[in-house]
Amino acid sequence: MLFATTLVSAIGPKKGLAKGPMGPAEHLYLYEKTPVEDHAWTIVEHGSWGKMTILFNKMFFVFNGHKLVADTQYTLISYREPGNTWPATNCAILGTGTADANGNVHIMGFLMPLLVYNEYPTDTSNEYSGTGAKVWLVLSNDMDGTTLQDWNPAEYLFEGDLLRLPSLI
């Protein structure tokens, strides 16, 4: 079952709302992972990573990625599970950015594109249970509109956990 919404709660390594000058925020961490067929993917120690800060009261986010390939364009997406077919279509584009000479990328925007929520486990993914959205940083060249057409997982950052619907709903 797939559905979309703009309400989101980030459940990650750091639980609970952080209070900042712009109001309550949550954080979602993305990591470089080692793809392992039929097993949970492991986080690459000292690998590329990113942090997404979501400001609920403004439905605004900021993403900062680190240790990326310099001068490479990246796209932050909300990934739609493809079922048992490939490629994954109708992924939500949250923003794009180019890594600077130090391998850092900065992407920010409003959560106006609908985040894609999947019901887990799915035909293609059993690492989670419940409902949530996967957020990935992928190579912009691997996207064709909202379709993730190419697969280069060693070059991507993957969620540390799902973005989940707020518990108030």
Where would I find each of the regions flagged by the language model?
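N-terminal leader/targeting pre-sequences
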Residues: 13-169
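Secretory targeting signatures
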Residues: 1-14
